[in-house]
């Protein structure tokens, strides 16, 4: 299995699949926001940024999968998936255990050199409350789904990282 993952990581198909999954998830988020009129909260925006990190890792990987750039893509993938998992878990806890002491910020807080909410407010501006449950599918709220999604990204990324130390046949 590890040799297979190593082989896949050195081809473009697996990276394109990762790009496709991230694009579908980002498109779903924009559909929820602009068509279904669900208001994204600060945590939703941060989770969206983590998903863009996974998307960026896929783009890096597809550019040159047989070069050391692949290692940078894998590291970005792990970093983004881990960050997204932490954010989704924290968001889930806010929704499952609401408390006046456990709230999210009123506004997104990006660094001045990366003011995404000012550059593209239709995608990165938060207008909702993190503790409000707006959407449910199969008894799970959106942050709970994201916990599973980011956990899956993280597990696959860790396996791909480990597979890099197995030689290709």
UniProtKB/Swiss-Prot annotation:
TM segment ranges: 15-31, 50-65, 72-89, 145-163
Gene Ontology terms for molecular function: electron transfer activity; protein-disulfide reductase activity
Topological domain spans for side Cytoplasmic: 1-14, 66-71, 164-169
CC annotations in GO: plasma membrane
Main location: membrane
Periplasmic compartment segments: 32-49, 90-144
Pfam family, one: DsbB
Localisation: Cell inner membrane
Topology term for the membrane: Multi-pass membrane protein
DNA-binding found in the keyword field: no
Keyword annotations of the record: Cell inner membrane, Cell membrane, Chaperone, Disulfide bond, Electron transport, Membrane, Oxidoreductase, Redox-active center, Transmembrane, Transmembrane helix, Transport
InterPro entries in the record: DiS_bond_form_DsbB/BdbC, Disulphide_bond_form_DsbB, DsbB, DsbB-like_sf
PANTHER family linked: DISULFIDE BOND FORMATION PROTEIN B
HAMAP family for this protein: DsbB
Function: Required for disulfide bond formation in some periplasmic proteins. Acts by oxidizing the DsbA protein.
Protein name: Disulfide bond formation protein B
Annotated organism of origin: Photorhabdus laumondii subsp. laumondii (strain DSM 15139 / CIP 105565 / TT01) (Photorhabdus luminescens subsp. laumondii)
